[in-house]
Curated annotation (Swiss-Prot):
Function: This is one of the proteins that bind and probably mediate the attachment of the 5S RNA into the large ribosomal subunit, where it forms part of the central protuberance.
Native organism: Bacillus cereus (strain AH820)
Gene3D superfamilies: 3.30.420.100
Pfam family, one: Ribosomal_L18p
Name the record gives this protein: Large ribosomal subunit protein uL18
Quaternary structure (record): Part of the 50S ribosomal subunit; part of the 5S rRNA/L5/L18/L25 subcomplex. Contacts the 5S and 23S rRNAs.
């Protein structure tokens, strides 16, 4: 019998493998991306202290969004999280794509964060 693999379960396994090798420090925190069907979330995390330094998502009221699950929204979230991180004194991050392919909304968020001043 042919069984179809659960995409989210395989993503979680992939993310766990990557997270075993990735850690964010106070000097170079981790930029984590979570993508749902309706929204996209980004956090800058210091894993040593277990603290989220800044975050942004499509749920933020200050972002004027037409849709929340498209590339334009991901771009605005990337710009927003990068601006907040630079204001908090973070210039370099480690990018954690969350087990997702570096394509589409994840890629748009990453490129917007780079253009807004984060280095990774």
């Amino acid at each position: 019998m042919i069984t179809k693999a659960d995409k989210n379960a395989t993503r979680k396994k992939r993310h766990a493998r990557v997270r075993a090798k990735l850690t964010g420090t106070a000097e170079r925190p981790r930029l984590n991306v979570f993508r749902s069907n309706q929204h996209i979330y980004a956090q800058v995390i210091d894993d040593v202290n277990g603290v989220t330094l800044v975050s942004a998502s499509t749920l933020d009221k200050d972002l004027a969004l037409n849709g929340t699950s498209n590339i334009e929204a991901a771009t605005k979230v990337g710009e927003s999280v990068a601006k907040r991180a630079v204001e908090x004194g973070v210039k370099e991050v480690v990018f954690d794509r969350g087990g997702y392919l570096y394509h589409g909304r994840v890629k748009a968020l990453a490129e917007a964060a780079r253009e807004a001043g984060l280095q990774f």
